[in-house]
Amino acid sequence: MEFGLLGEAEARSPALSLSDAGTPHPPLPEHGCKGQEHSDSEKASASLPGGSPEDGSLKKKQRRQRTHFTSQQLQELEATFQRNRYPDMSTREEIAVWTNLTEARVRVWFKNRRAKWRKRERSQQAELCKGGFAAPLGGLVPPYEEVYPGYSYGNWPPKALAPPLAAKTFPFAFNSVNVGPLASQPVFSPPSSIAASMVPSAAAAPGTVPGPGALQGLGGAPPGLAPAAVSSGAVSCPYASAAAAAAAAASSPYVYRDPCNSSLASLRLKAKQHASFSYPAVPGPPPAANLSPCQYAVERPV
């Protein structure tokens, strides 16, 4: 009897039936409920005017309206943008108060304005890179052929020994030994070199007598000397030999000359010549007639 009652109870309530382990089985889902849910969602979507749930979700989103700025607002915003392209929060709030706008609108305007400014800068740089700097500078710099017509690059003869510069004439002449006219002269020239530069070339040779034109080039003869004395003095002048030796030494570029030794030698030579050259004695005053300092020659009337 008891087993029969248990079988009837299990048949009436299958959810309360126990398994062999003693755990209750979950109730099986009914297919009729799922179909009912799908039918309810289809009815709801059909009742919407768009006909699909996606259109309904798009309409539920709030669309942002486009802000229309007045000329005064744009002028104020542009002036502030020229002064500061990245305003902070307090500055944006002040601008919003001045322009009667919200801080969010001001922030968005500055963001868009910065993007526009960067785009313009990039386009200008791209134009400069495409055009390059050769076009504006091409009219300023003349071509190479017009600047240097005589120096055609790459057109030299194949067996030419001298470049085109050798055919050009220059106002100054180059020497193979002395490059410059003053290269052979020392920085501190001794008196011998100065005397050699002042003596004419005709007086450099010891056996020649310079003419009157050469003497006039030296400043003329002294006023107390006769022309004959002048002409003879050119040969017997004590400075002629020293000048000739200095000129001969200066004319030879292969002789090493020490400026200190040459100056000392010239000074010694001049001292010897001054010692040999004697001047006439100057006559002194006539001697007194044996008179003491306290005695005076007084003429007495006769």
Curated annotation (Swiss-Prot):
GO cellular component: chromatin; nucleus
Residue interval(s) of motif Nuclear localization signal: 268-272
CDD domains the record matches: homeodomain (cd00086)
One GO MF term: RNA polymerase II cis-regulatory region sequence-specific DNA binding
Protein's job: Transcriptional regulator which is important for the differentiation and maintenance of meso-diencephalic dopaminergic (mdDA) neurons during development. In addition to its importance during development, it also has roles in the long-term survival and maintenance of the mdDA neurons. Activates NR4A2/NURR1-mediated transcription of genes such as SLC6A3, SLC18A2, TH and DRD2 which are essential for development of mdDA neurons.
Residue numbers spanned by region Disordered: 1-71
Gene: Pitx3
Family under the similarity heading: Belongs to the paired homeobox family. Bicoid subfamily.
Disease: Mutations in Pitx3 appear to be the cause of the aphakia (ak) phenotype, a recessive homozygous disease characterized by small eyes and closed eyelids.
Motif OAR positions after renumbering to this chain: 262-275
Biased composition (Basic and acidic residues): 31-43
Protein localization: Nucleus
Organism from which the protein derives: Mus musculus
Keywords: Activator, Developmental protein, DNA-binding, Homeobox, Nucleus, Phosphoprotein, Transcription, Transcription regulation
Phenotype of the disrupted gene, per the record: Mice show loss of nascent substantia nigra dopaminergic neurons at the beginning of their final differentiation and a loss of tyrosine hydroxylase (TH) expression specifically in the substantia nigra neurons.
Tissue spec: Highly expressed in developing eye lens. Expression is restricted to the substantia nigra and ventral tegmental area in the midbrain.
InterPro entries: HD, Homeobox_CS, Homeobox_Pitx/unc30, Homeodomain-like_sf, OAR_dom
PROSITE patterns tied to this protein: HOMEOBOX_1, HOMEOBOX_2, OAR
Any Pfam family hit: Homeodomain
PTM annotation (Phosphoserine): residues: S52, S57
Principal location class: nucleus
DNA-binding region: 62-121
Annotated protein name in UniProt: Pituitary homeobox 3
GO biological process, one term: locomotory behavior
Assembly with partners or alone: Interacts with SFPQ.
